């Protein structure tokens, strides 16, 4: 998809704030600082529509981005960030669960995982949760530019094994720095529109 128009529509904390449109939605999930905002910005050819931050735990709402009047990206709060209180974390967890299990417009979830490291327990739980609810998942392995290309396959195998990866899902190696995987990500997303 060639994106010329993208805007943030609303930052929602509850279902009554979700956009009323029937446009398909693609949710973006991943632990704090995995590169969700950079992923959005790369896909929509913008520097900073989605605010990137060195501070983990920055996204605390469901941020709906309208893309080309054709779909919404929904950025969900990053999980696994220790400096957020248990109460906060439980609140985010409930908000994410409500959205993922009840939103009819949700077509697929892009689950972002850092290619450099084995998936965390949170990454694995998120993947299992999405599979339990029968949601199509696109795994995007971020920060590929940080490791030599020759090691990508090994890292991909480690991630797939830890997740007990479903071969029906897409697996994309991605870098917001080099734009590696940008086209593949759009191809995977467009299948669900």
Curated annotation (Swiss-Prot):
Domain of life the protein comes from: Bacteria
GO BP: any one term: division septum assembly
Listed GO CC annotations: cytosol
Binding-site list for GTP: 30-37, 57-61, 75-78, 142-145, 174-176
Keyword Nucleotide-binding on entry: yes
UniProt KW Cell division keyword: yes
Disulfide links within the chain: none
Residues covered by the EngB-type G domain: 22-193
Keyword annotations: Cell cycle, Cell division, GTP-binding, Magnesium, Metal-binding, Nucleotide-binding, Septation
UniProt xrefs under CDD domains: YihA_EngB
Any one Pfam family match given in the protein's UniProt record, by short name: MMR_HSR1
GO molecular function, one term: GTP binding
Matching InterPro entries: G_ENGB_dom, GTP-bd, GTP-bd_ribosome_bio_YsxC, P-loop_NTPase
Residue sites binding Mg(2+) per the record: 37, 59
NCBIfam families noted in UniProt: GTPase_YsxC
Family the entry assigns: Belongs to the TRAFAC class TrmE-Era-EngA-EngB-Septin-like GTPase superfamily. EngB GTPase family.
Protein role: Necessary for normal cell division and for the maintenance of normal septation.
Name of this protein: Probable GTP-binding protein EngB
Source species of the chain: Enterococcus faecalis (strain ATCC 700802 / V583)
């Amino acid at each position: 998809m060639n994106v010329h128009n993208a805007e943030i529509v609303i930052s929602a904390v509850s279902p009554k704030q979700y956009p009323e449109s029937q446009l398909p939605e693609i949710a973006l999930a991943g632990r704090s600082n995995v590169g969700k905002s950079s992923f959005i910005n790369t896909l929509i050819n913008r520097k900073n529509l989605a605010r990137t931050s060195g501070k983990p735990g920055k996204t605390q709402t469901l941020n709906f981005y309208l893309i080309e009047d054709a779909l919404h990206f929904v950025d969900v709060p990053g999980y696994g960030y220790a400096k957020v209180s248990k109460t906060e974390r439980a609140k985010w967890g409930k908000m994410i669960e409500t959205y993922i299990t009840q939103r009819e417009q949700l077509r697929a979830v892009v689950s972002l995982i850092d290619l450099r490291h084995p998936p965390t327990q949170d990454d694995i739980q998120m993947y299992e949760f999405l599979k339990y609810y029968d949601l199509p998942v696109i795994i995007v392995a971020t920060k590929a530019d940080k490791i030599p290309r020759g090691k990508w396959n090994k890292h991909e195998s480690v991630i797939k094994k830890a997740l007990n990866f479903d071969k029906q899902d897409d697996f994309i190696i991605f870098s917001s720095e080099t734009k590696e995987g940008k086209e593949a990500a759009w191809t995977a997303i467009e299948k669900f529109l």
